[in-house]
Amino acid sequence: MHTHNNFKTPSDEDELDDLDEDMVVGVIAEIEQEVLNESDSDNDEYDLVDMGAPVPDNDGDVSYDGNDSISSDDSFDPNAADSDSDDSMLDEAGGGSAGGATSAKKRKDDDNPSGSNKQPEATFDLDEDDETDETVRAMIAAIKKPRSSPPEIKLEDFITDICFHPDRDIIALATIIGDVHLYEYDNEANKLLRTIEVHSKACRDVEFTEDGRFLLTCSKDKCVMVTDMETEKLKKLYETAHDDAINTLHVLNENLFASGDDAGTVKLWDLRTKNAIFELKELEDQITQLTTNEQSKLLLATSADGYLTTFNISARKMYVQSEPYEEELNCMGVYRGDSKLVVGTSKGRLYTYNWGQFGYHCDMYPGIKSPISLMIPITDRIACVAGEDGNIRACHIAPYRNLGVVGQHNMPIESLDVNASGELIASSSHNNDVRFWNVKYFEDFGEIKYNEKHNAYKEQRHNLPSSKCSNTSDFFADLTKEDADGDDDPCAGPSNMS
């Protein structure tokens, strides 16, 4: 290590006094001349750099010390480390490396135009070693796998109800502001066809007629509107169709439909007439759902006050009313060749009635222990139910079995529907989203017998093929399969060679 022995500190007064004044003057003159020469040289170098010339190499210049200015004796620290020390060399090397990294980053940023938010496109390259990894192979398979259902639809407004068109790949979405959005759906993309402004208040139910020619909507504004799907114009307006807000509609055929309001009134309508065919009020609370069977002789209504009420359409009077239940009856469906009616409740129970015997249920299934507000028949023996827990569950009717989870939402599910082929389910939640689930696998579902052993706990949590979640048992099954394949491999395991 070199030391600065040729420099004196201001405290060495005796030695400083011995210096010859002429020598001091000469040294000062030489320093001033060197400063002037270096200043001229630096200006020439920077002028050349500005003109595009390369920065000159100063390694061969013995007078160059790497500093922009000369330090005076006043700033000298006798305890400072020598610039020629190993530490200072490391610092300079580190500084140069950092500067190089900064320059490289700047050049990379300069690839984009000034002010542009465009980022360099990322490439996903896989070498042979990557492709042998199980996770990477699974990712590649997922990317290449074609979609089996349309992508999600997201709206700004709350979705109150959804309905599939009976003949075309169109789905209607009713909103809380009274509009209806018509989307054409496809596995690759969804297309908004048009938005129809139909009601001044929340549109609570939307239905297509059996032939798909007309779109029926009811609202909190107490009106029923019929829109022509071809002309997109209003076909008929039933103004003040009810004295209270209308909650639900049910289409019987191409001409007849029924409506139910918040006060328990049920009305039957004919599109060819201006007024209702008949009106019955046998309930005191909201009508939650209306339905019929294929013969359409009886009209059934569930209500929030815990009654199942049946009306004789031809006689225009009440047929029978069930015993009261201490829970809301929210939804229902017809199964087993129109021989069974199943009703879902606010306590998560499923009640079964023999057709025509609606006074009291013949069977009860505890269900999912979460409020059931929606139900749609998928096949003659399989129903999908949904509610506040955000899960769509499939269950087998008579005997009752939880088949598993069809799909999930992050929030409570508001509406549920199945398309005409029975292969696609759509659901909307409080998150203003519509999701699609391919349930074609139910076509090959086998018969369930009453005496078959089953695990109700596992069945309730089992994820079906349409679910976005996988089963833990599937993961361990894959591991078991890999172990079995390894055992069959003649190259695996210890050698039997003698």
UniProtKB/Swiss-Prot annotation:
SUPFAM superfamilies: WD40 repeat-like (SSF50978). SMART domains: WD40 (SM00320). One of its GO terms (biological process) is defense response to Gram-negative bacterium. The keyword Lyase does not apply. Residues 1-131 are annotated as: Disordered. Keywords: Repeat, WD repeat. PANTHER family: WD REPEAT-CONTAINING PROTEIN 55. This is WD repeat-containing protein 55 homolog. It comes from Drosophila simulans.
